[in-house]
From Swiss-Prot:
It catalyses: tRNA(Tyr) + L-tyrosine + ATP = L-tyrosyl-tRNA(Tyr) + AMP + diphosphate + H(+). It comes from Clostridium acetobutylicum (strain ATCC 824 / DSM 792 / JCM 1419 / IAM 19013 / LMG 5710 / NBRC 13948 / NRRL B-527 / VKM B-1787 / 2291 / W). Belongs to the class-I aminoacyl-tRNA synthetase family. TyrS type 1 subfamily. The gene is tyrS1. ATP binds at K231. Residues 340-406 form the S4 RNA-binding domain. A motif ('HIGH' region) lies at residues 40-49. This is Tyrosine--tRNA ligase 1. One of its GO terms (biological process) is tyrosyl-tRNA aminoacylation.
Amino acid sequence: MSNVLDELIERGYAKQFTHEEETRKLLSEEKVTFYIGFDPTGDSLHVGHFIALMLMARMQKAGHRPIVLIGGGTAMVGDPTGKTDMRKMLTREEINHNVECLKKQMSRFIDFSDDKAIIVNNAEWLMGQNYIEFLREVGVHFSVNKMLTAECFKQRMEKGLSFLEFNYMLMQGFDFYKLNEKYDCKMELGGDDQWSNMIAGVELIRRKSNKKAYAMTSALLTNSEGKKMGKTEKGALWLDAEKTSPYDFFQYWRNVNDADVEKCLSMLTFLPMDEVRRLASLKDQEINKAKEVLAYEVTKLVHGEEEAKKALNSSKALFGGGTNMDNVPTVSIPEDMLSSSILDVLVHTKIIPSKGEGRRLVQQGGITLNDTKVEDFNYEITKEDFNDDGFALVRRGKKKYYKIVIG
């Protein structure tokens, strides 16, 4: 069995370990069952989750067994990590709906056949848990003084941390304990912001079961400026094609900064590292070839080869002056908006957030209509602006294209 840890370190996944050398030895000597938790606070995964999915896929390819822990129980409380305000509490019905949606999405990335991976919902043991028993069984092993120093609580302490959220660390630690007890799960993986919660599980297993457990955090997907990637003007970059079209998904990666190409190729694709370094070393206009490869590979993983090819062809057609518009996002206006100003139309279709932003873009030459730069704020859209295929083509900035249709 290959040791995957060196690969994870080389590709930039591994960040912190409870026991690095022991973890390396463990992964080289046995098939390890490990887990990553996902809270079902939405009905789709987004790019922030994709790092975790890639991490699981790489571990699975190396012969280890993933447990996908869906936090149906912990979602009733809400994770305070990285938040300055208390999260909206979801109903059981909302959580159950989201759990089903996430299960379907994850099956595209992880092989669940023949017990090669397991999906478990922590509602199984948390929802029926007797509170007094939980305090006696779990709470006795946690020091409040130590918990208050945890990074995950610091941002919330000034505004006020509810007792509900304060329990989250105990619940996550209990998750690891239950998975260790039932499935011999020896390792938890997660984002670097979960470090305190992960240590809690390692310590709980040691105290209650007198067994060794391990934790490793992965780097969060950030750009060269340290900001989280995966945010667009429309919000999060979703893995669900209904929420973020394959074309928009492709274009996001096609347009990343030059400085982020190597990191993204390394963490978000299965390309060999020699090829990653070769592509990342390209300069000037040549780096766009690397971005095209990045966009294609990531879109293929998330949406399949057919959708990736469609997005690639549409992107090439647009940037090369071609006419293939099949995968360009389409927005519509009612017929009674004909003769409205270009700014009214762009705001209505959400191509721009406001007229003020639209005026700024027009002044800077950042809006084109059918390849003609818009220079008049009050230009009126008419039927003459729509081609034989029934759409008008708007470009915002250098690379954002939209088809406007009537209907």
